[in-house]
Swiss-Prot record:
Protein name: Small ribosomal subunit protein uS13
KW Transcription regulation (keyword) present: no
Record text on subunit structure and interactions: Part of the 30S ribosomal subunit. Forms a loose heterodimer with protein S19. Forms two bridges to the 50S subunit in the 70S ribosome.
Annotated segments matching region Disordered: 94-118
Family: Belongs to the universal ribosomal protein uS13 family.
CC annotations in GO: cytosol; small ribosomal subunit
Disulfide bonds: none
GO biological process, one term: translation
KW rRNA-binding (keyword) present: yes
Pfam families: Ribosomal_S13
Length: 118
């Protein structure tokens, strides 16, 4: 298994799919990285030479991925909560942020139903 950005990328998959195992890299960004490095999308990760893998690591290193991206997202959410803006309040109360109805539905965000005590 090739190690890129601290992640073991599966050898048996095509390069375009294998790179999506890294948090922060989807199909579009994966295709852009491969186009910039000149690697064919259908090449398997296991078939890449060490020099090519180094070029790929450098290209992936230009983007914010994995731990840095996760940290950035959590800090952004924390910043919204500290500001006390509408989105921050919705995060704090574990409710949907983008205007969805909450009278019914929204169970995924709100969690399991709380029983009514009589």
């Amino acid at each position: 298994m090739a190690r890129i950005a601290g992640i073991n990328v599966p050898d048996h998959k095509h390069a375009v799919i294998g790179l999506t195992a890294i948090y922060g890299i989807g199909k579009t960004r994966s295709k852009a990285i491969l186009a910039a490095t000149g690697i064919a999308e259908t090449t398997k990760i296991g078939e890449l030479s060490d020099e090519t893998l180094d070029v790929l690591r450098d290209a992936v290193g230009k983007y914010t991925v994995e731990g840095d991206l996760r940290r950035e997202v959590t800090l952004n959410i924390k910043r919204l909560m500290d500001l006390g803006c509408y989105r921050g309040l919705r995060h704090r109360r574990s409710l949907p942020l983008r205007g969805q109805r909450t009278k019914t539905n929204a169970r995924t965000r709100k969690g399991p139903r709380k029983p009514i005590k009589r």
